[in-house]
Amino acid sequence: MIRVVVVDDSMSMRTLLERIINGCDGMTCVGAAEDASAAREMIRALDPDVVTLDVEMPGMDGLEFLRRMMLLKPTPTIMVSGRTTSGSDAALRALELGAVDVIAKPLLTRPADLADYARDIAELIRGAAAARVKGGALAAASSAGRERACAHRPRGAKKAGIAATRLSRVIAIGASTGGTEALRTVLQDMSGTPPPILICQHMPEGFTASFAARLDAICGIRVKEAEQGEPLHYGCAYVAPGHSHLSLAATGRLYVCRLEASPPVNRHRPSVDVLFDSVARLAGKRALGAILTGMGKDGAAGLLRMRASGARTFAQDEPSCVVFGMPKEAIAMGAVDEILPLARMGARLSEALQ
């Protein structure tokens, strides 16, 4: 049984989360706190498996509480964020501090919204319960490293390289739980001016633009949220927006982004399988595919199709994953050429382009 503590200053949100958690098989809400002080005592006394934490609370906010908790008692934590720009920025900062995942507060504008939200929360809690949490000095060192990288990166707008054509190489990367930090590591470790990189990271709508901007600030290449029909360029990474599937497409000789707000695939939109399938069809042996940390199986079948089309494929190894789900499924299917620790992935992708 997964034991969960809910921390939120809104009584209605606490009640909703308690009801959802207690209605799911295999999990129970053992406590609900309205502020950081109550949460600290509750977590100390109840020792939960997972914490859901409101980003924006009066007094000590969710970020400061998370920072202290990760130093003293690292616990898998899901950030529950408002749908504002400030809320999404804070949630992404929480992922840097060691939170496992983030979910937006529900809109509940349709009767089906509650069931969808309950399903999403339950999936995140199960993933968090299986996660390896990086707390204490490790989280602090990781955060400090990002700040140093940002401080020492040359200032000024980064220019994209030449446009990519149908003869160009392409890199496709998929990730879920733990992927925000894994992607940062991979992109920072790549050398030179790589071919276009298409990224599918499972993330709610409203968060991906901020995520891309944060990566852009600390990486040597340009990173942006993908836009419909935009040509792909060398030295640029394109992040799938949270509202649409991202596919590789072509207009004439040029590679472009295709966005489609079609139904979820493997319960995800954007879906890694959708991205990988499009790259397999269009780029074939000129592509590289990598599947990183994450819960579930999204991307495994698509990576197999990439490999069958001649692409070189890679998976993150179990010890370095936050959740060894998606890579495990891909490996079991025979979709993977090389299994690598995260610390080697970026450099190996660069080597494979030679």
Curated annotation (Swiss-Prot):
Keywords: Chemotaxis, Cytoplasm, Hydrolase, Phosphoprotein
Record domain CheB-type methylesterase: where: 164-354
A biological process term (GO) from this entry: chemotaxis
Response regulatory domain residues: 3-120
Cellular compartment(s): Cytoplasm
Cell wall biogenesis/degradation among keywords: no
InterPro entries: CheB-like, CheB_C, CheY-like_superfamily, Sig_transdc_resp-reg_Me-estase, Sig_transdc_resp-reg_receiver
Keyword Ribosomal protein: no
Catalytic activity field: [protein]-L-glutamate 5-O-methyl ester + H2O = L-glutamyl-[protein] + methanol + H(+); L-glutaminyl-[protein] + H2O = L-glutamyl-[protein] + NH4(+)
Domain of life: Bacteria
EC number of the protein: 3.1.1.61, 3.5.1.44
Any GO molecular function: phosphorelay response regulator activity
GO cellular component: cytoplasm
Modification after translation, per record: Phosphorylated by CheA. Phosphorylation of the N-terminal regulatory domain activates the methylesterase activity.
Positions annotated as active site in the UniProt record: S176, H202, D298
4-aspartylphosphate sites (modified residues): D54
Gene3D superfamilies: 3.40.50.2300, Methylesterase CheB, C-terminal domain (3.40.50.180)
Family, as annotated: Belongs to the CheB family.
Domain notes: Contains a C-terminal catalytic domain, and an N-terminal region which modulates catalytic activity.
Reported function: Involved in chemotaxis. Part of a chemotaxis signal transduction system that modulates chemotaxis in response to various stimuli. Catalyzes the demethylation of specific methylglutamate residues introduced into the chemoreceptors (methyl-accepting chemotaxis proteins or MCP) by CheR. Also mediates the irreversible deamidation of specific glutamine residues to glutamic acid.
Protein name, as recorded: Protein-glutamate methylesterase/protein-glutamine glutaminase 2
Lineage: Bacteria, Pseudomonadati, Pseudomonadota, Betaproteobacteria, Burkholderiales
Chain's gene name: cheB2
